[in-house]
Structures are given as C-alpha cells and as structure tokens.
C-alpha cells in the first residue's frame, strides 16, 4: 500500500462525507490505484476527541504515506495522481499548495512545507498575501514519521500540536506546485471532526 487517505467525520456530516468519498473514488479509479491507495474513515458522534480519532486512523493505516482530508473540504481533480507521483521520490513529506476560504468567500493561497514557519506574508510569485504553514495533517507524510508524532487527545488545535511534533522528524521533501486542496473554514459550524 502506497497511500492511506484518512478522514475523520461526524454522523451529522454524512452528505459532505459522501461528496468527498465520491471524488476520492473517482480519482482512485481514474489513476487505476485501487491496489495502492486505501481510504480509512472514522465516523462518530463526538464520543472521542478529534486527536484520538486521528490517532486511531494512523494506527489502522497500512500505506507507506498518509494524509488527512477534512470531511468538509474539497480536493482538486488531480490530488491523488500528483501525490502518487510525488511519493516516488521517497521524500519524508510532500509540500502542497491550496486555497483557503472563509464561508467560501475570498480565496487566499496557502503553502505547506517542512521549511516554513506559520506566517502570512506577501509572495511575489503569486502577487498576494500567502499563508505559509509548516507541514501539518493535510501534508502527505511517511506514516512511520506520523506515528512518531501522533496527535494530542484534544479536539481543538490538535492539528497545530501535531504539526509542531511532526516537523522535527522531516528531513527531505518534494513539492507539488499545482493547487491540490481547498480548505473552506465555516464560521457558522463550530463542530470539530
């Protein structure tokens, strides 16, 4: 198994999860990757913390690489194909670029990399403010390194703490330059995964 895609969800988000799974399955089929990509989902009704759910998923994964997709976000049509191509480099992690919106409003580009600190700054490359973030749960990373970092047993900012724990283990990286992910923060939905 090359890649484990891990998704935390809530019972009340069945429709959003179904849309995401349809897109993931379409991409797996179009890449002829069903033998090398697994999708593992953990759905509950907030019985355990998001961090505990993420750790359960990490422990169930068999892929050499793992990445999380939030059930209320969107992936671009080339997401899986580009990650599978990048995996061939055998780097510790894969730097990615995406779009961040609040309530599907103004689009802001973000970039994830082991080489960044968490900061927002102007990028001449994109002629706009870009959210530069260290590698986090959305970053495809070798599973063995994610297992060393693990998530704290909490539902708020567990991804940020995981990022701080993970980054010291990351020595090598390959970059996907194309947009692959759309993170849409919903100000009206305070439910955690």
Predicted regions and their residues:
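Short, well-formed alpha-helical segments that are part of the catalytic scaffolds
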Residues: 7-29
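Short aromatic/hydrophobic "clamp" motif used to bind/position activated sugar donors
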Residues: 66
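Conserved donor NDP-sugar-binding/catalytic core segment of glycosyltransferases
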Residues: 80-110
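A recurrent flexible, glycine/aromatic-enriched loop bordering the glycosyltransferase active site
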Residues: 117-141
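Acidic donor-binding loop at a coil-to-helix junction in glycosyltransferase catalytic cores
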Residues: 156-162
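Catalytic donor-sugar/metal-binding loop of nucleotide-sugar-dependent glycosyltransferases
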Residues: 165-182
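Glycine-rich, basic loop-to-helix element that forms the pyrophosphate-binding segment
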Residues: 45-61
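The conserved acidic donor/metal-binding loop of glycosyltransferases
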Residues: 70-74
């Amino acid at each position: 198994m090359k890649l484990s895609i891990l998704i935390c969800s809530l019972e009340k988000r069945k429709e959003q999860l179904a849309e995401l799974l349809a897109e993931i399955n379409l991409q797996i089929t179009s890449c002829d990757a069903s033998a090398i990509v697994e999708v593992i989902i953990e759905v509950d009704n907030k019985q355990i913390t998001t961090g505990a759910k993420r750790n359960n998923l990490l422990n169930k994964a068999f892929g050499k690489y793992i990445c999380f997709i939030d059930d209320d976000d969107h992936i671009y049509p080339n997401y899986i194909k580009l990650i599978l191509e990048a995996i061939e480099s055998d780097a510790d992690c894969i730097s990615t670029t995406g779009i961040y919106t609040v309530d599907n409003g103004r689009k802001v580009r973000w970039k994830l990399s082991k080489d960044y600190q968490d900061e927002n700054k102007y990028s001449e490359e994109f002629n706009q403010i870009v959210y530069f973030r260290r590698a986090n749960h959305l970053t495809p990373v070798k599973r063995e390194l994610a297992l060393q970092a693990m998530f704290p047993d909490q539902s708020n900012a567990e991804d940020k703490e995981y990022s701080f724990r993970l980054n010291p283990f990351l020595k090598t990286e390959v970059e996907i330059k194309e947009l692959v992910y759309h993170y849409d923060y919903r100000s009206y939905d305070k439910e955690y995964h």
